[in-house]
Amino acid sequence: MDENKRKALGAALSQIEKQFGKGSVMRMGDVAAVRDIDVIPTGSLALDIALGCGGLPRGRIVEIYGPESSGKTTLTLEVIAQAQKTGGVAAFVDAEHALDPVYAEKIGVNLDDLLVSQPDTGEQALEIADVLVRSGGVDVVVIDSVAALTPKAELEGEMGDSHMGLQARLMSQALRKLTANIKRSNTLVIFINQIRMKIGVMFGNPETTTGGNALKFYASVRLDIRRSGAIKNGDEVIGNETRVKVVKNKVAPPFRTADFEILYGEGISREGELIDLGVNHDIVQKSGSWYSYGGDRIGQGKDNVRIYLKEHPEVAAAIEAAVREKALAGFQHAPSAERAALEESGF
C-alpha cells in the first residue's frame, strides 16, 4: 500500500476508534477479530458436513423451511438438545402453540432448562425474542413459525378483512432491530417457516416462503428440508428418510445436500448416519453385507450394525470424530495476500 494511503487510513481508524470506541473497526487478521466460526451442531452429522463448518453458526440468523411434517421442528429440537449438552441455554418461542414436550424430551431436550413462550401476537413474539437475545444469556432462540406471527392489527380486525403486507413489514422491522443484537450476543436465532404456492407461475419454482423477502436477505443460512421416503419395519412405517438442501450459506459453499433418517419418537438416527458416512469416508469397511471397523467385524446388515453402535457408544464416538476430522479438515479462513503483506510490514 502507498505510504500516503497508509497514513490516511491510520488517521481514519484512529478517528473511528476515538468516536465509537476501541474495536469499532478491526482487521480480520487481528487476534481480536474472530475468523473461526463458533457453531452449534445440528444433531445430524451429514448436515454438519453439508453446512461446511460443523453446525449452525452462532451470532447469525438461520431459516429452516419445508412442507408440513417434513422434520422442521424435529431438527430445531435436535439443535436445542445439542446446545444444552454443552451447557447452553435455549428458548423456544412457540407462536404455533403446538410444541409437544413429550416428543421434545424423547429427542433429548432438557425440559427443566428450556425457556418456552407462547405469545398472543407476532409483535409480542418478536419482542420477546429481541429481549432474550439482548440479555446475552441465551445461546439458541427458535421462533416456530414465521407463518404464525400474526400482526396485532390482523387479530383485532374482522374475519375476511384485508391486511396486505402487514406481516412482511413486521418481519422487516424486527429483523433490522434483531441483527446487530444477535451478532453482539453471539446468539443463534432460528426461524422455522412454511411454504406457500405463488399463483399464476408458469415457469420456474412456484414455491415461496411466508413473511416477505426480508428473512431471505438477513438469514446467513437457509435450509430446505423435505421427506424423501418412508422407513418401514415390515408394513409399519417407523420413520422418514429426509433430505436437507443448504440453499443459502454465507459461511461456507452453499447448495450441498444431506440425507438422514428421522425415526418416530426418537428423532434423527445418529447410528444410521455414522454407518453411511463411515463407509463413504473409508473409516468403516463394507464387504458384502458385513461391516468392519478397525479390523474388527461389527455386524452383518445395517440394522445389526445400528444396534451394535447403540450398545457401544465409545465406538460410535470414535467413528464420528474420525468422520468430522476427515470431512471438515478444509474449513479455514485464510488471510488474503494483501493482508499478509500488510501484516509483514507491521501495519
Curated annotation (Swiss-Prot):
Cellular localisation: Cytoplasm
Q: Which residues bind ATP?
A: G66, P67, E68, S69, S70, G71, K72, T73
The record's Gene Ontology cellular component field reads: cytosol
BP GO annotations:
DNA recombination; DNA repair; SOS response
Q: Which SMART domains does UniProt cross-reference here?
A: AAA
The organism's superkingdom is given as Bacteria
The UniProt entry, under Pfam families, shows:
RecA, RecA_C
SUPFAM superfamilies assigned to the protein according to its UniProt record, in alphabetical order: P-loop containing nucleoside triphosphate hydrolases (SSF52540), RecA protein, C-terminal domain (SSF54752)
Gene Ontology molecular functions: ATP binding; ATP hydrolysis activity; ATP-dependent DNA damage sensor activity; damaged DNA binding; single-stranded DNA binding
The cross-references to PROSITE patterns, in alphabetical order and at most eight, read: RECA_1, RECA_2, RECA_3
Q: Which InterPro entries match?
A: AAA+_ATPase (IPR003593), DNA_recomb/repair_RecA (IPR013765), DNA_recomb/repair_RecA_CS (IPR020584), P-loop_NTPase (IPR027417), RecA-like_C (IPR049261), RecA-like_N (IPR049428), RecA_ATP-bd (IPR020588), RecA_C_sf (IPR023400)
Alphabetical UniProt keywords: ATP-binding, Cytoplasm, DNA damage, DNA recombination, DNA repair, DNA-binding, Nucleotide-binding, SOS response
Classify the main location: cytoplasm
What family is this protein classified in? Belongs to the RecA family.
Chain's role: Can catalyze the hydrolysis of ATP in the presence of single-stranded DNA, the ATP-dependent uptake of single-stranded DNA by duplex DNA, and the ATP-dependent hybridization of homologous single-stranded DNAs. It interacts with LexA causing its activation and leading to its autocatalytic cleavage.
Which NCBIfam families does the UniProt record give?
Answer: tigrfam_recA
Q: Which HAMAP family match?
A: RecA (MF_00268)
Q: What is this protein called?
A: Protein RecA
| Organism expressing this protein natively | Methylococcus capsulatus (strain ATCC 33009 / NCIMB 11132 / Bath)
